């Protein structure tokens, strides 16, 4: 299994436009072969002082993929290219972490 944490920060004033495009893309991603989880998340409220927030303009995709081949196919999917084209000028930063389970 492959895990992905993708942290996206919007340029000022662009948060809602990115979220709209991302939300519209989620069903196509979840339908991909090998997609186990694909969740669009934002900071939880009311979690207390132990939480380190990303901030209002940042959201995180939490993903699980069956294997590296499924993740690579996802990255090359036409709907991902269309999503990237819609949001490329709206994003301030994008950091993608790809990880393997450490508890094997």
Positions of predicted regions on the chain:
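Short amphipathic alpha-helical segments
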Residues: 14-40, 79-83, 87
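Glycine-rich beta-strand-turn "strand-cap" elements at beta-sheet edges
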Residues: 39-54, 82-104
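Catalytic cores of transferase enzymes with a strong primary signal for eukaryotic protein kinases
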Residues: 60, 75-77, 98, 102
């Amino acid at each position: 299994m492959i895990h992905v944490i993708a942290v996206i920060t919007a340029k000022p004033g662009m948060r809602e436009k990115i979220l709209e495009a991302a939300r519209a893309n989620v069903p196509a991603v979840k339908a991909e072969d090998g997609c186990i989880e694909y969740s669009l998340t934002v900071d939880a409220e009311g979690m207390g002082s132990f939480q380190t927030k990303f901030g209002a303009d940042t959201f995180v995709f939490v993903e699980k993929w069956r294997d590296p081949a499924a993740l690579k196919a996802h990255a090359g999917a036409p709907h991902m290219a269309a999503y990237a084209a819609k949001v490329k000028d709206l994003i301030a930063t994008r950091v993608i972490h790809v990880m393997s389970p450490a508890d094997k």
